[in-house]
Amino acid sequence: MTGQGSGGWQTFGERTVYDDRWVRLGLVDVRAPNGERWEYHVVHLARIAVALLVDDTDRVLMLRRYRFIPGQWGYELLGGLVEDGEEPAATAAREAAEESGWAPVGEPTKLVGFEPLPGNVTAPTEVYLWREFDRIGEPTDTEEVGTVEWVPLSRMTDLAARGELLGAGTLVAVLYYLASRPCGGPGSNRQPDGL
């Protein structure tokens, strides 16, 4: 890769240092725009799909849980790794049902796609919005231990400021959704244009 579209960066190949189902670590042979050449560490994570379920009283379905890596409690949206051959929206719907016992209904609106750490990590993330869903039972995913809660949108900026919205998928999704809504003040249940 070279030229204007690559910002002057050139890549000459990548060798894998570690690889499993969850993560692949590679060393990419690169030349920077300043002419220096070296092996750059790149972490490749699986594609991720996130479900944002918002009810008609402006509450968001979330999982309150403890994450041992940062050592903290907080709120997360539902979602997970996109399986081979699975569409991201289907992943988000499946994960929501497994983790919460609430199944999204109908076609979602794709809210946003992003790379959370583009400096040295690939983790393509897509967020889907549903405004309709059915209670189908208890959560079935035994690895996702936490409490399922409907959290008012009006609490989201405070939770974000306190660092209690865990993970980029949750933070980006919630703040994007809030920023996309027409001005209606706290508690407004008007939807973003086209949603």
Where are these regions (language model features)?
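Cationic, low-complexity basic patches in intrinsically disordered or flexible, solvent-exposed regions
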Residues: 192
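Unchanged
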Residues: 38, 45-50, 55, 80-169
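Acidic, metal-coordinating catalytic segment for phosphate/diphosphate chemistry
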Residues: 9-50, 56
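Short beta-strand micro-motifs in enzyme catalytic cores
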Residues: 24-28, 73, 124-128
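A glycine-rich, hydrophobic loop/mini-helix early in the fold
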Residues: 47-72, 76
